[in-house]
């Protein structure tokens, strides 16, 4: 791993701060998606008929929700189904997003206004992103431990570095 990776959170996501949580969903393989800001409706056959104007989440990294210094839900919960884990996340009141911070070069924390945190945890080596952020105008950001932050567009192919 490159020890010189810049951990600075991209300024391009600062417009997300202060936005209310409008969507939360646990998906396949215990992925997590949190939507913030305005609802952006789509016609895809999905549980939610909309995304958030801003979406932050992970496809494969472990995550946990901490509220008032108590662990209230996590991706490794002993549940019978993804629907059961999704039901747990639906009852949590997330409120507005305050900020995003790197806890270390491995882990990221989403800070919400009501003493709630969502943490994404890197627990294996590899090239998969820890977290991704979709924003307005096809903005796409991702963080991976081997590359740091990358910023681009979600509507065009990315070139290999």
Model regions and ranges:
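Surface-exposed, interaction-prone regions used to assemble/regulate multi-protein complexes
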Residues: 1-161
């Amino acid at each position: 791993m490159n020890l010189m990776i810049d951990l600075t959170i991209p300024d391009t996501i600062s417009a997300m701060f202060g936005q209310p949580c409008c969507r939360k969903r646990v998906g396949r393989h215990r992925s997590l998606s949190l939507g913030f800001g305005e609802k952006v409706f789509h016609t895809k056959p999905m549980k939610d008929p909309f995304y958030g104007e801003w979406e932050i989440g992970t496809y494969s990294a472990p995550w946990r929700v901490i509220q008032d210094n108590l662990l209230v839900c996590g991706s490794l919960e002993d549940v019978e189904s993804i629907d059961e884990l999704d039901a747990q996340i639906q009852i949590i009141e997330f409120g507005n997003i305050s900020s995003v911070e790197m806890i270390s070069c491995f882990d990221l924390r989403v800070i919400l206004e009501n003493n709630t945190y969502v943490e994404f945890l890197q627990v294996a080596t590899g090239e998969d992103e820890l977290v991704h952020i979709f924003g307005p105008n096809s903005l796409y950001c991702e963080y991976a431990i081997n590359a740091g932050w990358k910023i681009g567009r979600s509507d065009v192919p990315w070139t290999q570095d």
